[in-house]
From Swiss-Prot:
Species, as recorded: Bacillus anthracis
Protein name according to UniProt: Methionyl-tRNA formyltransferase
Key words, A-Z: Protein biosynthesis, Transferase
One Pfam entry name: Formyl_trans_C
EC number of the protein: 2.1.2.9
Source species, domain of life: Bacteria
Enzyme class: transferase
CDD domains: FMT_core_Met-tRNA-FMT_N, Met_tRNA_FMT_C
Catalytic activity: L-methionyl-tRNA(fMet) + (6R)-10-formyltetrahydrofolate = N-formyl-L-methionyl-tRNA(fMet) + (6S)-5,6,7,8-tetrahydrofolate + H(+)
Lineage of the organism: Bacteria, Bacillati, Bacillota, Bacilli, Bacillales
GO molecular function, one term: methionyl-tRNA formyltransferase activity
UniProt similarity note: Belongs to the Fmt family.
Encoding gene per record: fmt
């Protein structure tokens, strides 16, 4: 029986681990990030992958820094035939990558060489792509740069969010891995080198990227809102207060107005001018210190005026 070590951390990784178990591989160990404090009460919380591994009685390693010798030697001591990673969250050292008989392969949520990095799902939507996918490739020390083994495309729908696409890609990754591993073991795959001229990056989202830039086109603002839903959530400011924007709709704007200006107030939301003739009607938001709500609820208690400028005094 093929001995596998799985390395992963978030919810995205769980279906991949589950599929390895269902397919009958001997998952001899799981490597995941350390437990972290979560929420206002800072409750020490295990990763989703750790929770899944413990359900199946699989030993769990939680290195703070996998590149340290005493940490990676614990992985090597398991003597896996194959290592599978999916959103592990740390750079894996060569000592691990070169050890298994069948190598170390990664399940990545983009069609490499596009969108290397830690936030490929967010960027696929923020960039307005109509499709993305899963790549399974050999791991190297350079970020997501290994030779490609298999790929599958996944359509991005018009109203897709990072949350819904995350779920689709997670399942697609598990399914593709299920088909890839037997072919890899049988020596039936021809690795393909990535074209370095086509490389783009999707680095982790920074706080300053979350703010809506109303000078962009309506389509770009709409994609920005979808791409940051349900985390970390796009935001703007209204009357100097931070407001998270959970959802908006593209609408035509007939009269010219400065980008970021409220040009219409309707029952289910208010329309904001952008950098072109497509405005964005905010329909779901979250004022600072309050719960997420529909814009119609918000408008019952707050009455912004037409001409009010959003995005100032952030």
């Amino acid at each position: 029986m093929i001995k596998v070590v799985f390395m992963g951390t978030p919810d995205f990784s769980v279906p991949v681990l589950r599929r390895l178990i269902e397919d009958g591989y001997d998952v001899i160990g799981v490597v995941t990030q350390p437990d972290r404090p979560v929420g206002r009460k800072k409750v020490l919380t295990p990763t989703p992958v750790k929770v899944e591994a413990e359900k199946h009685g699989i030993p769990v390693l939680q290195p703070l820094r996998i590149r340290e010798k005493d940490e990676y030697e614990k992985v090597l001591a398991l003597e896996p035939d194959l290592i599978v990673t999916a959103a592990f969250g740390q750079i894996v050292p060569n000592e691990i990558l070169e050890a298994p008989k069948y190598g170390c392969i990664n399940v990545h949520a983009s069609l490499l060489p596009e969108l290397r990095g830690g936030a490929p799902i967010h960027y696929a939507i923020m960039e307005g792509k109509e499709k993305t996918g899963i790549t399974i490739m050999y791991m190297v020390e350079k970020l997501d740069a290994g030779d490609i083994l298999t790929q599958v495309e996944v359509e991005i729908e018009e109203r897709e969010t990072t949350g819904s696409l995350f779920d689709k890609l997670s399942e697609a990754g598990a399914h593709l891995l299920s088909k890839t591993v037997p072919l890899l073991i049988q020596g039936k795959l021809e690795p393909i080198k990535q074209n370095e001229e086509e490389v783009t990056f999707a680095y982790n989202i920074k706080r300053e990227q979350e703010k809506i830039d109303w000078t962009k086109t309506g389509e770009e603002v709409y994609n920005h809102i979808r791409g940051l839903n349900p985390w970390p959530v796009a935001y703007t400011t209204l009357a100097g207060q931070v407001v998270k924007v959970w959802w908006g709709e593209k609408v035509p704007v007939t009269k010219s107005a400065e980008a970021g200006t409220i040009v219409a107030i309707e029952e289910d939301g208010f329309v904001v001018a952008t950098g072109n003739e497509t405005g964005v009607k905010i329909t779901e938001l979250q004022p600072s210190g309050k719960k997420r709500m529909s814009c119609s609820q918000f408008l019952r208690g707050t009455k912004p005026e037409i001409g009010t400028k959003l995005g100032e005094n952030a």
